């Protein structure tokens, strides 16, 4: 029996990261030729932010050299799992990844990508990362409308980014779990990536104990967060900061990895 006609969003792509479930409509065009989005990059170039992925893998290897096996990386705002897959693959036999994604449909793709790439050292969690555990309501975008879904902000504010469609923060919302990283009581954390669309400071507050005890390397998207507050929070905890594209790389002053970095632009 023939099924109903329906538009397909998620497809399988043979990418440089492996076989990936990706939304072919995950893009926002800024002109006739240029656009952005995780899906856009993968389908146009076979890769997503390869330089950033390479840097993260190198930093994980450095943590292994200085702290031994058992490296743990947290991918907060994991999207469909490019970083998660690459990290888990690189750390086979000596490290693991906890990937956290708030958008339900994207979380399904993340979990599928972990499975299809046989990353038995990676785990996915459907939640938003914040300052305290609980629940929150987040918007439900239309995944059939071309948009940069990874740019979706979970909280409404005066200058929310236009991702390719209007977002309603009061109707058709979904209640999801909200986690603070400290609630996991992890004995060791080596690396935390925060790409949570303006909730980076909240996520840091919820990881304060973990950061103070483990002094992990932090890679934080900075374009939607107050720079002065972010720099101050990290500096108070002994971190040295470097600008890496749209991200802020923070390495504790006592971390031997700091001496291995090539000269880079220090954060002001």
Features from the language model and the residues they span:
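S-adenosyl-L-methionine
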Residues: 1-103, 108-113, 117, 164-170, ...
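Catalytic metal-binding/acid-base residues of hydrolase active sites
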Residues: 79, 103, 130, 197, ...
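Generic hydrophobic alpha-helical segments
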Residues: 55-60, 180-181, 207
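Short N-terminal helix/helix-N-cap motif within the alpha/beta-hydrolase-1
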Residues: 82-85, 108, 134, 201-205
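Glycine-rich adenosyl-binding loop in Rossmann-like folds that engage adenosine-containing cofactors
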Residues: 23-53, 120, 125-187, 261-264
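Short, solvent-exposed polar/charged micro-motifs at secondary-structure junctions
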Residues: 76-78, 132-137, 187-188, 251-254
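Conserved acidic-Pro-Pro-aromatic motif
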Residues: 17, 71, 88-99, 182-268
């Amino acid at each position: 029996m023939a099924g109903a006609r329906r538009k397909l969003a998620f497809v399988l792509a043979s990418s440089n990261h492996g076989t990936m479930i990706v939304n072919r409509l995950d893009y926002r065009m800024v002109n006739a030729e240029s656009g952005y989005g995780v899906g856009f990059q993968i389908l146009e170039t076979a890769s997503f932010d390869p330089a950033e992925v390479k840097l993260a893998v190198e930093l994980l290897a450095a943590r292994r050299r200085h702290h031994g096996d058992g490296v743990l990386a947290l991918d907060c705002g994991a999207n469909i799992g490019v970083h998660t897959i690459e990290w888990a693959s690189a750390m086979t036999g000596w490290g693991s990844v906890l990937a956290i994604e708030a958008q339900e449909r994207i979380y399904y793709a993340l979990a599928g990508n972990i499975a299809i790439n046989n990353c038995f050292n990676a785990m996915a969690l459907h939640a938003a990362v914040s300052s305290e555990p609980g629940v929150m309501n987040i918007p439900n975008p239309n995944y059939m409308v071309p948009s940069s879904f990874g740019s979706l902000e979970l909280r409404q504010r005066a200058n929310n980014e236009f991702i390719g469609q209007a977002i309603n923060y009061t109707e058709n919302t979904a209640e999801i779990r909200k986690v603070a990283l400290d609630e996991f009581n992890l004995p060791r954390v080596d690396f935390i990536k925060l790409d949570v669309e303006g909730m980076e400071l909240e996520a840091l507050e919820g990881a304060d104990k973990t950061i103070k005890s483990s002094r992990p390397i932090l890679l934080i998207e900075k374009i939607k967060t107050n720079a002065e507050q972010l720099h101050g929070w990290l500096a108070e905890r002994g971190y040295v900061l470097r600008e890496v594209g749209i991200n802020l790389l923070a390495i504790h002053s006592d971390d031997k990895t700091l001496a291995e970095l090539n000269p880079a632009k220090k954060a002001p």
